[in-house]
Amino acid sequence: MKILSIDVGIKNLACCIIETKPDMMFKIEKWEVINLCGEHPTCCFNTKKGICGNKSKYCKNDIYYCRIHSKKSEFLVPTSELLKIKLKRTKISTLLEIAKKYDININGDKSLNKSQITEKIIKYTDEKMLEPVKEQSANNMNLVSIGISLKNELEKYSDIQNVDQIVIENQISPIANRMKSIQGMIAQYFIMKDITNIDFVSSSNKLKEFIGDQKTTYAERKKIGVNITKDILAKNQLNMDWLPFVSKHKKKDDLADSLLQGLWFLRNKKLIKI
C-alpha cells in the first residue's frame, strides 16, 4: 500500500508519501513542506561561485537582491528618510536637505511648494531606489488564492494516481475555520482525481503509542515528535538517508507530523511495525 499523509497548513503544508514493504517494513518515497503563499524570491546576484540564491530583501525591474548584494547594485538601498509616507510628513527645509544630499534637481526654483518638492523626490526614488520585497502573509490570502496554489502544488505529484490512500489531519478547533476549509479543498482535489480513499485523522493519534495519556504542551509535543522521527529514521535501514534532510530542515516539526500521522495509520491497519 502507498499512502499520502498530509499535515494541513498554509505556509507549512507537510506531505509524506509512504509505501509499505515486505516484512512489515515501510519506505518514505516523498517528503516535503509546501508553502501555499509561494516561495520567497531569492537573490539573483551573480557571484564568483554562481547565483547567490539567498533570501531576497529588495528588488528592481524583477531582479532580486539580498541585503548584502543590494549594496553592490546600481540602485539606492532604501532608507527611512526616503520612505514615501515619511516624505509627505517631512518639513520643507528637510526635504530641501534630502534633495541636496541625493543631488535631486529641483531646478533651483524657490517657488516650488512642499507638495511639488515631495513629488520630485518620490519620482527620483521610483527610478533610482530598490523596492523592499514584501513577505506574503497567510492571513492576507483569500481561500480562492489558497485553492489555486494548492491545486498547482498538488499537480506536481505526477505519480499521485499510484497512491492508494490519502490521510489528512482533521481540523477540529473552533478557531480553525480556514484550516477546515483547506482540509475540505484537499479532499475535494483528490475526489475529483477519482481518489476517494480519504481518511481524516485526529492529530492526537500520532504520538499516542509513544507518550500515552501523558499531559504535554503544544511546544512539548512538537519537540517530542521531532525527536521520535529522528530516532525512527536513525534505526530504519530503508529510511535513514532522510535523517540529514530532516535535521537541516527549518520545519522539522511539520515534517515529523506528516510522517508520524502516516505511520500511525499504517500501524493501526496492522500493515507495518516500527
Please name every model-derived segment.
Residues 1-274:
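Phosphate- and other anionic-substrate recognition elements at nucleic-acid/protein interfaces
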